Swiss-Prot record:
Classification via PANTHER family: ANHYDRO-N-ACETYLMURAMIC ACID KINASE
Transferase listed as a keyword: yes
Gene source species: Escherichia coli O6:H1 (strain CFT073 / ATCC 700928 / UPEC)
Catalytic activity as recorded in UniProt: 1,6-anhydro-N-acetyl-beta-muramate + ATP + H2O = N-acetyl-D-muramate 6-phosphate + ADP + H(+)
EC primary class: transferase
Protein name from the UniProt record: Anhydro-N-acetylmuramic acid kinase
Length: 369
């Protein structure tokens, strides 16, 4: 069974940077050693946003974007190796999620698409890469997401305490770690995605630092109620979503009925939308004693305060409190999934994704001996 140093690479729907994590992994433990966040050039970020919102592009443009993202991921890995004074031979493999540009797990031909050419990563780092983690689960009738609940269960489940892990990235997803029950998990809806999109369009800022804009505004209740009527929120699990659904166009369609509103009030309303949709799903799933939050949203003081207020009797904390950096959780999970793939172990949970069976995930891109 492969064990040793693994690297996880994650570029999520928030597009706030490439997260790279170095960890030692074996069948008994996962020990994080180092991490860094690598910037995404504005031009690449905009290209990804455009494709996620349905903008047409040529096959040549698509191929170039795939290559450019692969090179970006390789640069991020090499930066971490240099920082840690490590060589390619010191790493067993890289687990690279890729950049999701479309996720449509239902319909006549369900599919999901993550780009960032793994061949570029192998060629530029000299390290074996495991990627394309989601499509095997979809081929077996699953949603292909979320995949991180299996990792949450391995690291954070408790024999007696009802726990849930909440990742607030661009999309928010919940892992249900309830003693005596199968692991559950699904996307609750927008996390930071709509908040980030709004402040970017209105103020040219990548995100609402410390929720300053949202805290300066007031929740527009009719707008909130209008958005809460979206059918996704009442759809039963298993379910997953992404930027191709909850994007700026989605927000604009709701704002048409509310002309002339204060932009800060919209920001406050979007923060409340995220908090309410998450808390409702926690309660619908039977509640928990401890909600451990990770992802960029765990740094949003307004979101954390609203979750605590909406979930009385639940201890709302970050995963940092149990020794796992909330910023690195997903990248660490894909390092772990790469280890499982190389070990021939399943990486999905049918109770989460709805797949017909457990399966080994991903494709292996071997480095030269």
């Amino acid at each position: 069974m492969k064990s040793g140093r693994f690297i996880g690479v994650m570029s999520g729907t928030s597009l706030d940077g490439v997260d790279v994590v170095l960890a030692t992994i074996d069948e008994h433990r996962v020990a994080q050693l180092a991490s860094l966040s690598w910037p995404i050039p504005v031009s690449l970020k905009q290209a990804v946003l455009d494709i996620c919102q349905g903008q047409q592009l040529t096959l040549s443009q698509f191929g170039q974007l795939d290559t450019q993202l692969g090179r970006l991921f390789a640069d991020a890995v090499n930066a971490l190796l240099k920082e840690q004074n490590l060589q390619a031979r010191d790493i067993v493999a890289i687990g690279c999620h890729g950049q999701t540009v479309w996720h449509e797990p239902t319909g006549v031909a369900p599919h999901t698409l993550q780009i960032g050419d793994n061949n570029q990563i192998v060629a530029r780092t000299g390290i074996t890469v495991v990627g394309d983690f989601r499509r095997r689960d979809i081929a077996l009738g699953g949603q292909g997401a979320p995949l991180v609940p299996a990792f949450h269960h391995a690291l954070l489940a408790h024999p007696t305490e009802r726990r849930m892990v909440l990742n607030i990235g661009g999309i928010a997803n919940l892992s249900l770690l309830i003693p005596g029950q199968p692991v559950g998990g699904y996307d609750t809806g927008p996390g930071n995605m709509l908040m980030d999109a709004w402040i970017w369009r209105q103020a040219g800022k990548p995100y609402d630092k410390d929720a300053e804009w949202a805290r300066a505004g007031k929740v527009i209740l009719p707008l909130l109620q209008n958005m809460l009527c979206d059918p996704y929120f009442s759809q039963p699990a298993p379910k997953s979503t992404g930027r191709e659904y909850f994007n700026y166009g989605w927000l604009e369609r709701h704002l048409r009925h509310f002309p002339g509103v204060d932009p800060r009030d919209v920001q406050a309303t979007l923060a409340e939308l995220t908090a309410v949709t998450i808390s409702e799903q926690v309660l619908l799933s039977g509640g928990c004693e401890r909600l451990m939050v990770c992802g960029g949203g765990s740094r949003n003081p307004l979101l954390m305060a609203r979750l605590a207020a909406l979930l009385p009797g639940t201890e709302v904390t970050t995963t940092d409190a149990v020794g796992i950096s909330g910023d690195d959780m997903e990248a660490l999970a894909f390092a772990w999934l790469a280890w499982r793939t190389l070990a021939g172990l399943p990486g999905n949970l049918p109770s989460v994704t709805g797949a017909s069976q457990e399966t080994v995930l991903g494709a292996i891109f071997p480095a030269n001996p």
